[in-house]
Structure formats: structure tokens, C-alpha cells
Amino acid sequence: MNIFVYSLITLCFLLLFSSCVDVSNKCKFDIAKLEPRTLNLLTQDILPGLEGKTKGEAGKVGIIGGSIEYTGAPYFSAITALKVGSDLVYVITTESASLVIKTYSPDLIVYPFLKANHLHKIKSLIPKMDAVVIGPGLGREDETLQLIYDIIEHCKILRKPLVLDADGLYAVSKNASIIKDYPQPGVILTPNQREAKKLLAAISSNDGEWNSYWGENVSILVKSEEDHFYSNTLAYNWGSKEGGSGRRAGGQGDILSGALGTFYNWALSSKLCGKEHIQLAQSVATYAAAKFTRLCNSKAYAINGRSMTASDMLKEIHSAFQETFV
């Protein structure tokens, strides 16, 4: 046989075998932590198809946040959830913030109900949502915190996938037991290092351990120069510092929370590795959101340098999404 033809056949066989190994091995990670290569392969599996779908099947995400001081945070979270692929995004915010957010985008569904006397209206909206993000721009007023506790309790009853960020994390640091034993499909917390220390202090005061006190359905992403994901299953934990830059623009965490709301719903719906494993879904969705956000950051920084803002990161969503999922 011609040596060139033989080499070509051998190369084709190796490529085919490599592909088969990828497919068969990506779900075999019972002993060691998930590696980036495996996480990237699993990330591809959560992306839903577009053919033959009706509006809403790619996800309906709710963002609960905003205040008289902060209108950008819930907008960044909501518009990201929409632009990465959720079909519908609802924003529940204060009356003063609602008008501003509506002027930012006609694509978002905005409700001016974030007030204690509207709790019944909020409860009537949550069943529409496939995943709920609580915290962006929420504020820390006592009335607001109590309202958030009531909303979290209602999400528990409805078993809604929950993402807690920013002032939502502050609320938990003041009442750590509010998410204790949260039912499946669970909660993902997304603190930065400062917020993580406050949460750790809250857990310590309750004589609890960092990632076991809340129960097996609560996972944590600690954001820093290197992101770290913690769950109660060691194999699903990971660390990653790919992408990103030294520029920490205000609003970057809100972008991540919105993306995570969408990806969390997708991961839960995809039955990764042929099984409904909540912690695996949380791990892969969080990895995808962290990688995507870091790519938005690095791409925006390459263009804008130190003048980069979260608004510049929004412009890189399409490109970052393609690199994350394709």
C-alpha cells in the first residue's frame, strides 16, 4: 500500500478514535476533579437546539433586583440572560427603577412590583420562570431584605432553580439558614472574595462547614483572579482562570448572574451524562457562565483597555458565546 495512503488512513482512524474517546470518557470523572477539557465537552451538551421549538422552550428567566440607586445591575443581568439564549426574561424591580430599565431595552418584560405590599403579585409571577436570579442592584433596606426572604421561601416551595448574587448574598449573610436544605434543583451562590468571607463568617457563627451547612443542593462559585466552584461532590469541583483581564468593571458580576440563570436552566433540562444529577448540572452551568463572562471581559479589554465598562462587555456577548459553545 502506498505509504501516503496508509498514513492518511491511520490519521483518519486516530481522529475517529479520538472523537469516540471524547464521547465515551467525558462522563468518567468519579475520582478526580473535572478537568477543563471535560468541562468544555460537557458544556456543548447543555446547548439546546433551535429547530422545531416554540417561544419559551429555550427558557424563561426571572431577575429580581434593582433599586432607586441601582438600575444598571438588573439590566446587565437581564439583557445577558436574554442575549445568551433565553426566550423571555422578566425583571421584577422597584417602581422607580422600572421606568429606567424599560428605556434601556424594549426586549425585557419589566414589573414594578418589588415592594412588600406587592408580594402576592411577585408570587403569582414566579411560576412562569424556569430559573430565578436574585440580587443585582437590590439594595440593603430592612424591608427589602424581608421581602427577599419571603421570595426565597416561595421559590423553595415551587422548587425553582435559584442564583443568588450581590445583595442577594448580603441577605443570606444576615440570615444563613434561609437557604438551608433548599430542595432540588437547588441554589448557586456567586460571591466575590469579600462576599465569600462574609458568608463564611455567617456559617461559622452557626457552627457549620463552608459547603455542607446548606445541604447537598447548594453550590458556590467564588469569583477572583482564579474562579473556584465548590459543591458537596468533590469530583464536580473545579478552578479556572482562562480569559479575563486585570480590569474589574462594575456590572461584570451581573453579566455572569444573567448568563448563569440561562445556562442553569439549560443544564438541568439536558440530563448531562444520561442522568439527572443536580450538582453536575450546577457545575457545568457555572463553568460555562464563568468562562463566557471572562471571555466577554478579555475581548472588551483588548479593544478598550482601562476604559472598558460592563456596557463594552455586552458588545462581546455573541463572540464570547461562540467560543464558549462552538
Which residues are covered by each model-predicted region?
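Small-residue (G/A/S/T)-rich helix-start motifs and N-terminal tracts that mark the onset
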Residues: 3-4, 9, 13, 17-161, ...
